[in-house]
Amino acid sequence: MKVLQLALFILLPAFASAQKPAPVCKCPDTTFVSSAAKPLKIFHFSNGRSIGLFGYEETKLITGKTLYSEFVLSECGAKKVIDFWGAVLTCDVTFANDTVYVKTLYGFPVGRAMKPEYLPWTIERIYFSGGKAIRKLMINPAIPKYTPAQVAMVFKQYQQAPNENSDATIDLADKLLISTMSGSKKAKYLLVNFKNKFTTLDGAPAEAYDTIMRMLGLWEKM
């Protein structure tokens, strides 16, 4: 037994020196994230390639869950990043079945009493095929829809809403978006012409409305 232990002791350094060092994953030079930034995550693919996530963590939005904002994804060793997700986006980034999933979250008014609930808006899959990184984007098909009674309630809220530049006004626009996605043509008309009624939109609420309209445009394309 002592002879075997001695042999293993002698061979271990040889095995250790033969192992390949862990791949170094650095962020390419970019205006989005410092090239000195260390990856928050590294996703290792079965073809031997890896993708690093560089940026900032968000831990307060959903209790017990680490999300990411203002970050890039880059293949380790590449000179260019795959893409950049800005500070206005909060994403859940996971890895399964040799695929990186980037889920962009949004506070949809689909919770209890139509309260906002953070759910994936878009889901992007990033994987390798034929040596190339492939990206496929889709809208989350599981976003809850409104019942006809809920849509009618949104219309009533619209009629009673004051012309003010507020979060409540944008909450109403969010509800019109869900009503539109639930099949209401009237809701789409009201949403598209939203500024005709709410003429005071400015600053952050105006930017939020523009975001909702971009979401509507993407939903119509998909």
Label for each model-derived stretch:
Residues M1-V24:
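Bacterial Sec-dependent N-terminal signal peptides
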Residues Q19-M222:
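Exposed acidic/polar residues on beta-strands and adjacent loops within beta-sheet cores, strongest
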